[in-house]
């Protein structure tokens, strides 16, 4: 029998007591209908308790561990089943003492063994409840209750065997659950070792980019292996750069082959041939104008033919090119080639111009030396005056020729000279006469003077006025040229060249020959009278459209001016016929050295112009 005060026992669960009492009430025949409701309530309570136990196991898993109680001689270990069984007190009898060491060893094994089996504590608890609650009908369970409502029970041999099996199962399940519950989510977190982090750089110990990892892996390779890998496996940028470089090299080779090909050689050959022909024909006085045109034409045509060839080749290259870089490079090469072609053309024109200028200078020096030998004396000032062009030309052509005479710069090249300037230079060079035929043309000029007298008496007043103004202006210009230079300055007459006959001499608007002769005369008239006679003529204007200078005639002329003209006319009217006769006789007897004396020529030219103006002022008066 079980005595309540002898030994501590395991208290029985209240739920089991209620279920036992309900079973006893059902056995009674005179129970009421309320018992059914009580039974239902008991079932609900059981379910709720099971759910509570499950929640407790999840929250506090260590509370369901089996606690060992010392005292092998008089008690078994108490098994705490988390409220399902408050206490189970098993009093061993004489035959049960042999099983006590086995139970104790199993309890020690439960505390020592640890296995990893997840979430089996609940199943073990359910099985243990089932074993404890569902007692077999063949087993005898004695229930003793004391006054303090403490229930103790005792089981026989068959009940003990079932209890031992349940305890063994519980020990295995609880031991596996302890190891599982020890492992938490924090165990999976890597431990950060600060000692190892201090060895790395301060800015990358927390985060390392994947590129740096790749670079670190590449550093491990040898340089030869790395070069082999880069050369075998090109990046897209490297391939694009290679393609552009290959395209540029191909275009450079094509331009080089084009520059050396026979496509451009005929134009260059023709240019050289025509330029050489032009340089050879520069010595003749009548071919300068045509030569300049030929130079200009051949230079421009050669450049155009070369440029057209370059343009066609550049279009082909632009079609063959595959990238934008090669196209832009093609344009750059085309511009560079054009610059080279222009440079070569300019160099060729420089050579031709230098050759022409040297030829003209040598020709002038030879003629000047011939005249100096004939005269015996020839000063430097006279040579400079002789080498310059006549002052009757325009100012721009004068400055151009003076710079061309003293400097070898190619101002007549097509790039820096307009066709009008070249034509004017050609015209003046063509009509410049040699010095050796002065006497013959003096005699011809006498005939032209007689023709002028006839025209003056036959033409109406308008024509006479134009003739008078033309002669007056020309005489004033000759006086200006004489006053600007010294008295010993050479004055050259303008006359047609040997290749041009007198019938082809150009005439002005009034059918008067444009070429005048300054005839030598007697030095009897003073220079002051000539200057006073030129003063009213200088005040006259001229018309640029017709190329002739005319007097602005008005009804009321200045009396002083007219008086001066009349006085001069009266003073020099007696010398007119004697001058013409003496000049005609001097054409065959006077030597050439006396003909070219500058002082007599200047005075005679001024005298000749003054005699032409003697009676001309009366023609405008009615």
Swiss-Prot record:
Name under which the protein is recorded: SLAIN motif-containing protein-like
Alphabetically ordered keywords of this record: Coiled coil
Record field: compositional bias (Low complexity): 405-415
Chain ranges passing through the membrane: none
Keyword Coiled coil among record annotations: yes
UniProt biased composition (Polar residues): 416-430, 484-502, 525-591, 599-611
Keyword Coiled coil: yes
Coiled coil: 34-60
Similarity remark: Belongs to the SLAIN motif-containing family.
Region ranges (Disordered): 404-441, 473-622
InterPro entries: Slain
Highest taxon listed in the record's lineage: Eukaryota
């Amino acid at each position: 029998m079980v005595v309540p005060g002898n030994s501590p026992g395991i208290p029985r669960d209240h739920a089991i007591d209620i279920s036992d009492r309900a079973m006893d009430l059902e056995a009674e025949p005179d129970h009421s209908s309320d018992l059914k409701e009580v039974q239902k309530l008991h079932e609900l309570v059981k379910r709720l308790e099971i759910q509570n136990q499950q929640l407790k196991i999840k929250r506090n898993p260590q509370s369901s561990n089996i606690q060992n109680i010392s005292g092998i001689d008089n008690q078994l270990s108490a098994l705490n089943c988390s409220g399902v069984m408050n206490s189970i007190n098993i009093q061993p009898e004489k035959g049960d003492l042999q099983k006590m060491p086995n139970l104790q060893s199993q309890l020690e094994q439960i505390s020592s063994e640890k296995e990893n089996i997840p979430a089996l504590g609940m199943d073990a608890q359910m099985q243990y409840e089932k074993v404890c609650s569902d007692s077999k009908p063949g087993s005898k369970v004695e229930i003793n209750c004391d006054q303090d409502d403490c229930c103790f029970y005792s089981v026989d041999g068959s009940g003990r065997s079932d209890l031992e099996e349940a305890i063994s199962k519980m020990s295995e399940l609880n031991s596996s659950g302890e190891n599982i519950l020890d492992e938490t989510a924090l165990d999976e977190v890597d431990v950060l070792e600060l000692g190892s982090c201090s060895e790395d750089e301060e800015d990358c110990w927390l985060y390392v980019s994947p590129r740096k990892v790749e670079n670190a892996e590449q550093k491990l390779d040898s340089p030869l292996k790395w070069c082999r890998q880069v050369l075998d496996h090109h990046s897209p940028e490297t391939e694009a750069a290679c393609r552009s470089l290959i395209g540029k090299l191909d275009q450079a080779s094509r331009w080089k082959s084009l520059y050396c090909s026979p496509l451009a050689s005929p134009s260059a050959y023709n240019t050289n041939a025509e330029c050489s022909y032009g340089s050879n024909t520069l010595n003749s006085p009548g071919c300068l104008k045509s030569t300049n045109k030929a130079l200009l034409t051949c230079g421009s045509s050669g450049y155009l033919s070369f440029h057209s060839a370059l343009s066609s080749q550049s279009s082909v290259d632009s079609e063959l090119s595959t990238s934008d870089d090669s196209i832009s490079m093609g344009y750059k090469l085309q511009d560079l080639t054009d610059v080279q072609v222009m440079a070569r053309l300019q160099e060729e024109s420089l050579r031709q111009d230098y050759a022409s200028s040297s030829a003209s200078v040598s020709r002038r020096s030879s003629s000047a030396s011939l005249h100096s030998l004939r005269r015996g004396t020839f000063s430097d000032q006279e040579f400079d005056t002789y080498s310059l062009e006549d002052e009757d030309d325009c100012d721009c052509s004068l400055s151009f020729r003076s710079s061309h005479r003293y400097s070898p710069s190619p101002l007549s090249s097509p790039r820096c000279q307009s066709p009008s300037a070249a034509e004017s230079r050609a015209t003046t060079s063509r009509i410049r006469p040699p010095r050796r035929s002065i006497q013959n043309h003096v005699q011809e000029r006498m005939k032209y003077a007689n023709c002028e007298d006839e025209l003056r008496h036959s033409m109406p007043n308008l024509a006479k006025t134009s003739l008078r103004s033309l002669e007056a202006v020309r005489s004033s210009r000759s006086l200006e040229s004489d006053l600007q230079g010294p008295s010993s300055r050479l004055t050259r007459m303008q006359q047609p060249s040997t290749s041009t006959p007198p019938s082809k001499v150009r005439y002005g608007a009034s059918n008067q020959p444009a070429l005048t002769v300054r005839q030598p005369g007697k030095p009897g008239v003073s220079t002051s009278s000539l200057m006073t006679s030129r003063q009213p003529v200088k005040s006259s204007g001229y018309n640029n459209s017709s190329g002739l200078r005319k007097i602005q005639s008005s009804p009321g002329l200045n009396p002083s001016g007219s008086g001066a003209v009349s006085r001069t006319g009266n003073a020099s009217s007696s010398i007119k016929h004697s001058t013409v006769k003496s000049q005609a006789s001097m054409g065959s007897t006077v030597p050439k050295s006396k003909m070219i004396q500058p002082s007599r020529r200047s005075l005679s030219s001024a005298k000749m112009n003054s005699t032409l103006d003697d009676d001309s002022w009366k023609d405008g008066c009615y």
